[in-house]
A protein has these predicted regions:
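Residues lining the SAM
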Residues: 105-108, 135
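A short glycine-rich, Lys/Arg-flanked "PGG" loop and its adjoining helix->strand segment in the class I
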Residues: 116-131
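Short, glycine-/aromatic-enriched active-site segment of Class I SAM-dependent methyltransferases
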Residues: 9-10, 133-155, 161-164
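Short N-terminal helix/helix-N-cap motif within the alpha/beta-hydrolase-1
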Residues: 50, 112-116, 144
Length: 249
């Protein structure tokens, strides 16, 4: 991720609809898996740390994070998060069988990440019968050149491809569902429009993360929050992201 994207993330992560909605979904997932105040949770690729902050406040203080960006880690520490280190998901600096759950949110698709190595590392640091939680972007046809250059991510996934990768590493899928289903048509239309816009090759690539008017931001959050409640009862067959909840076999 470009360094200026970390600053944007830090400034928006606590209020932006997408982050608020996703982090609320992840809290529901952790609670459904029985995580409590004694649980140890790893956020591998923690960005600027808002997900960690919410887990620490709502579930357990034993939450640890790593990110390959020193600037991202510095911003995490600005949030008051102590258990942070500069490291790659390709080489996680924790002992085997350490965590009750290890999550990696929108990381596997990044260009610097070696899929097989990262999944093997996530499995290694989780305790026997512990959980690996992944969120990845869905559908190759949703690739956006500007956005993915800015976040340095060139992969998107189908459910079958992700499931195959997990089976290869003996990570048992407990649940796999799409996310952001209701907003998929709008996301697709926006991405297609961006891809057809003329851009100078010298333009500094920017992600789609930018402040929105309050009414729009809150409206989008309420759509995602309604979907969060629906996810407590069922899986979604389509959506712009995929959530995989897995158990160490």
């Amino acid at each position: 991720v470009e360094s200026y994207e970390y600053e944007t993330m830090y400034n928006l992560e606590s209020t932006y609809w997408w982050y608020r909605g996703l982090h609320s979904i992840l809290l529901d997932v952790l609670r459904s898996l029985g995580m409590d105040t004694t649980s140890k949770v790893l956020d591998a690729g923690c960005g600027t740390g808002q997900n960690m902050a919410r887990i620490s406040k709502s579930i357990t203080e034993h939450v640890y994070g790593l990110d390959y960006s020193p600037y991202g880690v510095w911003l995490c520490r600005e949030r008051g998060l102590p258990n942070i280190c500069v490291a790659s998901v390709n080489d996680i600096p924790f002992s085997s069988d350490t965590f009750d759950a290890a999550m990696s949110i929108d990381v596997l698709e990044c260009d610097e990440v070696l899929e097989d190595r990262a999944l093997a590392e996530l499995r290694r640091v989780v305790r026997p019968c512990g959980y690996v939680i992944l969120v990845v972007p869905a559908y190759d046809w949703l690739l956006s050149e500007q956005h993915h250059r800015a976040v340095r991510a060139s992969r998107r996934y189908s459910r079958s491809r992700l499931a195959s990768l997990l089976r290869k590493h003996e990570i048992h899928v407990v649940r796999m569902t799409h996310l952001f289903a209701a907003l998929l048509p709008a996301v697709a239309a926006y991405r297609f429009a961006l891809n057809y816009m003329d851009r100078s090759p010298n333009d500094c690539p920017r992600s789609e993360l930018k402040p929105l008017p309050h009414f729009i931001n809150e409206s989008l959050f309420h759509v995602v929050d309604a979907e969060r409640r629906l996810l407590r009862r069922m899986d979604l067959p389509f959506g712009s992201s995929i959530l995989a909840v897995c158990r160490k076999a």
